[in-house]
């Protein structure tokens, strides 16, 4: 109902869906990072009373985690039918939300493994209302994962990088790199592969043809 406050999980769902609905969101890693990260971060920051600086730090953390996950797979998730925003977003947003919540390393690991089980979104749903909801679900999944981890819920040791974890399961040809993420904090995707901002509210792959037509 209008004027009534909702939970952080619901806020992330609604705002993430709305952010992706117009197709005017930023682009990187064959996905739309801010569409997932910002709704999750704003919802959690408001819930926990985090400062603007801490929210920005959470964004950078989430972006770096997203870049790290993306770098592990050389083949296209789209070609396999996966929507990268939906399948990578929950883990990146969970890392950001766990930072804002102040979870320790053990609880953060649980939250990330839970997020690996919350992923999903297929290309077959492109062109429908389900596609923007992929982003909303990814954002809300982060809050849900952090809530469960904080409450003592359990999950596998490594739901993301294990031989039977998410990255291996998603990999189109089983060629994913599952080595430890030793580059986090020393290699910065936010500077080497920064966000790209759209000129037009359509899929980014259409921008060059649009420019050619307009020229």
PLM features: residue spans?
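N-terminal core-entry segment
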Residues: 1-193
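A conserved active-site cap/scaffold subdomain adjacent to cofactor or substrate pockets
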Residues: 185-215
